[in-house]
Swiss-Prot record:
Boundaries of every S1-like domain copy: 1-72
Name of the featured protein: Translation initiation factor IF-1
Pfam families per the UniProt record, alphabetical: eIF-1a
Organism: Xanthomonas oryzae pv. oryzae (strain KACC10331 / KXO85)
Phylogenetic lineage: Bacteria, Pseudomonadati, Pseudomonadota, Gammaproteobacteria, Lysobacterales
Keywords of the record: Cytoplasm, Initiation factor, Protein biosynthesis, RNA-binding, rRNA-binding
Protein family per UniProt: Belongs to the IF-1 family.
NCBIfam families linked to this entry: infA
Compartment(s) where it occurs, according to its Swiss-Prot or TrEMBL record: Cytoplasm
InterPro entries: NA-bd_OB-fold, RNA-binding_domain_S1_IF1, S1_domain, TIF_IF1
Entry keyword NAD: no
Reported function: One of the essential components for the initiation of protein synthesis. Stabilizes the binding of IF-2 and IF-3 on the 30S subunit to which N-formylmethionyl-tRNA(fMet) subsequently binds. Helps modulate mRNA selection, yielding the 30S pre-initiation complex (PIC). Upon addition of the 50S ribosomal subunit IF-1, IF-2 and IF-3 are released leaving the mature 70S translation initiation complex.
GO cellular component annotations of the record: cytosol
Length: 72
């Protein structure tokens, strides 16, 4: 799958789950499960409940995503 196929949304972290997984509430009202991207994991970027994040999703499964950016 190429990067062009992914869909980006913004949302806020509503709950922290085990294994660097988070429940994210998107701006359109949907709630998804998202994990941290490898680059964020490598650079030890911490994500807390309430943080605004950018989530990348595939059009094939709209219930899971990857957190690619934490807003300041």
């Amino acid at each position: 799958m190429s990067k062009d196929d992914s869909i980006e949304f913004e949302g806020s972290v509503s709950e922290t789950l085990p294994n660097t997984t988070f429940r994210v509430k998107l701006e359109n009202g949907h709630e998804i499960i998202a994990h941290i991207s490898g680059r964020m994991r490598k650079n030890y970027i911490r994500i807390l409940t309430g943080d605004r994040v950018k989530v990348e999703m595939t059009p094939y499964d709209l219930t899971k995503g990857r957190i690619t950016y934490r807003m300041k």
